[in-house]
Amino acid sequence: MGTPTPYSAHSPRDSESSYFSHTSPPHGEHEHDEQEQSLLERNNSSHYGTPFDDPAVSTDSLRRYTLHDDGPAVFAAPPYQESEAASENTFRARSNGDKASREGSRAGALRRYGTRKINLVQGSVLSVDYPVPSAIQNAIQPQYRDAEEAFSEEFTHMRYTAATCDPDEFTLRNGYNLRPAIYNRHTELLIAITYYNEDKVLTARTLHGVMQNIRDIVNLKKSEFWNKGGPAWQKIVVCLVFDGIEPCDKNTLDVLATIGIYQDGVMKKDVDGRETVAHVFEYTTQLSVTPTQQLIRPQGNESTNLPPVQMIFCLKQKNSKKINSHRWLFNAFSRILNPEVVILLDAGTKPGHKSLLALWEAFYNDKTLGGACGEIHAMLGQGWRKVINPLVAAQNFEYKISNILDKPLESAFGYVSVLPGAFSAYRYRAIMGRPLEQYFHGDHTLSKRLGKKGIDGMNIFKKNMFLAEDRILCFELVAKAGFKWHLSYVKASKGETDVPEGAAEFISQRRRWLNGSFAAGLYAIMHFGRIYRSGHSIIRMFFLHIQMLYNVCQLIMTWFSLASYWLTSSVIMDLVGTPSTSNKNKGWPWGNEASPIVNNFVKYGYVWVLTLQFIMALGNRPKGVKIPYILSYLYFSLVQLYVLILSFYLVVGAFNGGMMDFNFDEGVGTFLSSFFSSSGGGIVLIALVSTYGIYIIASVLYMDPWHIITSSWAYFLGMTTSINILMVYAFCNWHDVSWGTKGSDKAEALPSAQTKKDDDNKQNFIEEIDKPQADIDSQFEATVKRALTPWIEPEEEGGKSLDDAYRNFRTVLVCLWVFSNLLVTLLITATGVDKMCLTNTSTTRTSWYFEVILWITAGLSLFRFIGSLWFLGRSGILCCVSRR
C-alpha cells in the first residue's frame, strides 16, 4: 500500500492560538482551581498551552507533532475501503452538522492508507489498540510514562472493544477483558458516571470534578491504605456509561476525544453480523476540560497537576435506560475489576472538594457499611442569583432540610430509604446477589429472559416502583439474608447538581419522584418481614421497627395531606376571621362583616383551582398548559401567605390577651390548660415552632443556616403547592411509567466489521485501516476546536403517548384517593353526621381534628430533630477516631 508522503509542518500561528483563549457563556459554573487557571493564563502559545511533545526530542520531531500540521498528502482509497470510509464520514457529518467537518471528511475518503490485520480474541471478540494523538501522548508526565512498571501501550494507545453481547456475558471466559485487570491492578474505587443527553458543560463539570477528587486522594500524605501496594491512581477507575449513540450530545464526544478516551471512526456497528451492543473505550489520561471549555494539562511537577486517571468509556449503541447502564457497570465491568467501592454519579453532578474521599473513608472505617450517600445541594449560580427563582429557592431549601433532618435520622437507624443515584456509593460485594437481581428486574432488555418476573410481567404498581429503583436497592441491601449491611449519610461529602427552573420540567420530575417513592415505600413496608432473615443485631432490629412505624405514619400523613391542608387553612381562617366568643367577636383582618366574606371567596377559589389541577393533570401535558400552572402556583402561594399571617396573628393575640388569651394568673395548671386548649393559640404555636423553629435551630446547629435566609420564603409559600399541584399531577399520571426521555435505536451510520480467515484457515481476523500518526494528529486539531467552542443549548423534544389500560388504573387510584380525603373532610365539617361521630357538633369535631393534626406534625418534627442531634454527636465522635 505504500507509506504516506512527507508533509510540511509549521509553527503555531497566533491567530489560531487566540481562537482557544475564549470562555463559554455562563452556565451556572463559576469556580475552578486558581492554580489551574493560572496555568492557562501563562501558557497560551497553542491550544494546549504549549506543545505536548517531549522536550528531549529533536526540533524536527517537535515540529512534526505539533497540533498545527497541515497533514499528509491525499491518496485514492482502495475499492474495499470506500464503503467503510463513507460510513464513517456519514456518522461524523451527522454528528457535527458542520460544513467544514463534512468537507474534511470527504477529503479524508480520498486518502489511501495501508491496512493491518487484527486477530479476534477467541475468534469472536474485536479488541483493537489505536494510537492516540501525539499531543495527548506527550501530555503524560515522564515520571508516569517512563516508569519501570508502566505498560508501553497504556499512554500511547486507546483500546477499543466492540461488545456484541449482553452485559451478563461480558466475561473473561467469553474473551472480554479490561486494562486494569490485564495489568493485574487492584481496583479499590470505581467511579461511575451515567449519562443520557447532557451537554458538554454538564459532562465536563462532573468529569473535571471527579479528576480533582482523584488528585485529592493521590496527594494524601498520611494514609494507611492509599500509599501502600502501588500508586494510588492505579487503584481508581473512572467509568462513563452513555445511554445510546443517538441521544448523545456529539459535542460531549469531542470533549472525550480531546482528553483521549474516545476516537471518531473506530466504532463498528456489528462484527460478522452480530450487532454491537456497547462500544468500550479505554485510556489513561492526565488531561481534563473544565466546564468553561479550558483545557487542563500537567505543568512540571507541581502538586496541582492531575494524576493519571484510568478511564473506561462505554457508549451503548441503543438507548436502553439508566438501569441498563447500571447493569453494564455492575454485571459487566465490576465483575472483571471487582472493586471494593462503587460510586455513582449522574452527568451534571459536581462532587465537592474531597467528597469522594469522604465517601470512601466511610466504607474504610465501617466494614458493615453497605451503602452511603453525600449531601446534594442545588446549583445556585454566581452570587446565588438563582434563588430569585422561587422554584430553585424552594428546591434548595428542600434539599438542605432533607440533609439536616431526614438523612441524619435515617442514618441513625441504619436504613436510609433512598441513596440518590446522582450521588451515592455502594460496597460491591454487599449488593451482589439478590439486591442487584431485584434491582435489574426493571431493565427492559431483560423482559424476554425474565418473563413474568420482568418489566413486561409487572403490574402498574411495580412499574411505578422502578421509577425509584434506588429505593428498592436500598431496602434489598439492608434486608439481605444472613448479612448485617446498613446504610449511612456522610455529611462531609457534598455534591452540586442543577435543578429544574421551569414549572413544567419541575412537575414532570416530581411526578417520577413522588410516584416512585410512594410505590417503593409501600414495597418496603409490605416486605418488612424479610428483615428477620438478615443478620442484624437485636438493637438494630429494634430501631428498624421504630423507623418502620415512623415511615407508616409519614405515609398515612402523605395520603391524607390533601384534606389536611384544606382543613388546616379553612380552620385558621374561621378562627381568626369569623366573629365568635373564642376571638371576642372580632373578625380579622377585614373586620367583622368583611372577613367571613373574603375568607369564603378564598375557600371557593381554593376549591376551584384545586379542581382545575385534576382537569389539567388528566390531560398529561404540563408543557402545554404552562400559564395555568404558573397562575395556580401563584394563587396557592398567596393563600399560604394569607394563612401564615393569620396563624402568627392568632399566636400573638393569644399572648397579648387580644383573643383566646392564655391564663397567666391562676397557676401553672391553669396556664397549661389554657395553652393546650383546642380553642386556643397554643397548639398553633407548637405547630409553628415544630416546623419553622426546628428548621432554624437544626440549621444553626449544623452550621449551615444560609438557606433559611435565602430560600425559606419560597419553600414556606410553596408548601400548599407541593400537595395541590405536584401530588395531584403525580397520582393522576400514575399510569405513566416513563422517564420522560425519548430513546432511539439509530446506529446505521457506523461501519460493519467482516472477518476473514488466515492462510491456515484457523485464525479469524479483520483488516483495519492503519492511519499514520500525522493524520491522527491533524484530525485531532479539528476535534479540539469543536470541543472548546461555546456551548449551545439544544431544543427540547415532546412527550410520548400513554396506554389506555394504565389510564383505567389511574382513574381508580385517583377516585380512591379523592374519595377518602373528601370523606374525612365531610366527617369532620358536615353537620348531618352527628350520630356517626363521637361529638355532636361539627365545630368540636373540627377543633379535635385540628388538634390531632398539629400534635402529629409536632411529634414527627421533634422525632426528626432528635435523630439529627444524635447523628451530629456521633459524627463528631467518629471524626476524632476515623482512619484513612
Curated annotation (Swiss-Prot):
Q: Which UniProt keywords apply?
A: Cell membrane, Cell wall biogenesis/degradation, Glycoprotein, Glycosyltransferase, Membrane, Transferase, Transmembrane, Transmembrane helix
InterPro entries membership:
Chitin_synth, Chitin_synth_fun, Chitin_synth_N, Nucleotide-diphossugar_trans
E.C. number, please?
Answer: 2.4.1.16
Ranges that cross the membrane: 513-532, 556-576, 597-617, 635-655, 681-701, 708-728, 812-832, 852-872
The Basic and acidic residues compositionally biased stretches are 95-105
Q: Tell me a GO biological process for this protein.
A: chitin biosynthetic process
* Bias kind Polar residues: ranges: 37-48, 84-93
Carbohydrate-modified residues: N44, N301, N840
Its biological purpose is as follows:
Polymerizes chitin, a structural polymer of the cell wall and septum, by transferring the sugar moiety of UDP-GlcNAc to the non-reducing end of the growing chitin polymer. Plays an important role in septal growth or maintenance. Mediates colony spore formation. ChsE and chsD seem to play a functionally redundant role in lateral cell wall chitin synthesis. Involved in resistance to echinocandins.
Q: What is this protein called?
A: Chitin synthase E
Underlying gene = chsE
